[in-house]
């Protein structure tokens, strides 16, 4: 026991691991920059979007969602697409996915959808019946299913995926004009997917293929590029739409709300240390800057708390002081102490208001925000405009025949393992999306009649 070098070495080794992310555990990261195409002052006073050709440092983390850190990159899953902008007024995080919609529209169901996708608590084995049971009782997920179970749900390269903010934010210009905004990243390498069979093979042969592909491409100078587009909507328009634009299970029609190009992101530097820069990177939808606000998007409102809270659990209360998360602009507040605090404020005044320190810190200036009139009783209620099936049906009918067949085959490859009562409920949902869609699922499960099914033998 007197060999203090041994004790110190072993003690450090025993504590090398930190809690794994509950979702998005397996990931890859890269540094780069974002170059603004044109001044966006008409729409937002966000400082980093005002000067054409300005280059803003960024860090990006791509990830799978459900699997643990040792899982395969090619499994059917949404992919996380999180971007941290190190702006002159603080960090701004766009924390999105490679699919424009999500399973649910209310954050209170988020733990439930994740629980249904994770291994069963009694056996720790993945059971697709649990997920499809949840989906059969959550028809708002139909639109997401048409994306996830197409070949967009299986990829082998993060360089060849698009990204979407999913949530709706608010942009505010210097005159106080507020607009809803949705973010779109479009890969300049072209979207590439793989089918289920190749995904299953690669999961065994090269489970880290997407992480490796990104690292090797940057290492040899093939820098991935992604263009940022936004859709903008006057807040007054929301009431006249047949759906709620703050519903994360919906997309905005591009013919009515066209995409506007904002700039281009280039990833040109690999992390020097994976743990320090990728594992300890912390993205939070709550990280916004002047000129950008939160909407009443129910999923966003839940994420504002949850993401910051999970980082405090994983990394400690002072996670924003870690180099990868630290803002590149000056930060001044009265936060103090806590585990692993190393950046500190000099002097004796750590409160406000005060006279001894000139009433500092001074709050960052905000642009004038137009008055928003609110009246009525506060209540807990669901989104009223649901329409769970129209956009899912439009998505299905927009696929070509090969894409439809792949979607059907991918769904059936799991549904044959599901109890018949859940199958029948899902067929009803698919039929409400599109009659052909429902018929093909029913045919694959031999459920045209009420006889006992023959298990679907997928290709």
What do these predicted regions represent?
Residues 1-459:
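Active-site-adjacent core segments of small-molecule enzymes
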């Amino acid at each position: 026991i007197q060999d203090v070098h041994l004790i110190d070495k072993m003690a450090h080794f025993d504590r090398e691991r930190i809690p794994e992310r509950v979702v998005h555990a397996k990931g890859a990261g890269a540094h780069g920059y974002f170059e603004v195409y044109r001044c966006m002052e008409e729409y937002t006073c966000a400082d980093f979007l005002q000067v054409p050709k300005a280059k803003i440092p960024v860090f990006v983390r791509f990830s799978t969602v459900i699997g643990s850190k040792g899982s395969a990159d090619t499994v059917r899953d949404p992919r996380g697409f999180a971007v941290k902008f190190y702006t002159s007024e603080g960090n701004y995080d766009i924390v999105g996915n490679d699919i424009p919609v999500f399973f649910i529209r209310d954050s209170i169901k988020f733990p439930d959808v994740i629980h249904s996708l994770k291994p069963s608590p009694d056996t720790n084995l993945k059971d697709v019946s649990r997920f499809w049971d949840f989906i059969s009782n959550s028809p708002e997920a139909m639109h997401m299913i048409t994306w996830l179970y197409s070949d967009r749900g299986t990829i082998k390269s993060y360089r060849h995926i698009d990204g979407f903010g999913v949530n709706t934010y608010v942009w505010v210009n210097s005159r106080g004009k507020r607009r809803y905004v949705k973010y779109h990243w479009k890969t300049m390498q072209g979207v590439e997917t793989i089918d289920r069979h190749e995904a299953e093979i690669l999961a065994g042969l090269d489970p880290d293929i997407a992480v490796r592909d990104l690292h090797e491409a940057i290492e040899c100078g093939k820098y991935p590029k992604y263009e940022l587009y936004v859709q903008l909507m006057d807040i007054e328009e929301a009431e006249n739409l047949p759906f709620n634009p703050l519903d994360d299970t919906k997309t905005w029609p591009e013919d009515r709300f066209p995409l506007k190009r904002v700039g281009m992101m280039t990833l040109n530097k690999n992390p020097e240390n994976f743990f320090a820069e990728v594992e300890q990177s912390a993205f939070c939808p709550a990280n916004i800057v002047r000129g950008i606000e939160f909407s009443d998007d129910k999923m966003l409102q839940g994420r504002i708390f949850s993401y910051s809270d999970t980082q405090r659990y994983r990394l400690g209360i002072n996670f924003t002081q870690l180099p990868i998360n630290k803002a590149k602009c000056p930060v001044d507040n009265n936060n103090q102490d806590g585990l692993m605090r190393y950046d500190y404020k000099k002097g004796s005044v750590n409160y406000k208001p005060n006279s001894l320190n000139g009433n500092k810190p001074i709050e960052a200036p905000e642009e004038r925000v137009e008055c928003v009139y609110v009246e009525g009783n506060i209540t807990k209620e669901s989104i009223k405009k649901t329409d769970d099936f129209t956009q899912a049906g439009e998505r299905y009918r927009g696929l070509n025949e090969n894409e439809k067949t792949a979607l059907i085959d991918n769904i059936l490859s799991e549904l044959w393992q599901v109890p018949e009562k859940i199958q029948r409920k899902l067929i009803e949902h698919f039929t409400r999306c599109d009659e052909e869609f429902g018929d093909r699922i029913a045919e694959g499960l031999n459920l045209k009649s009420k006889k006992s099914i023959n298990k679907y033998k997928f290709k």
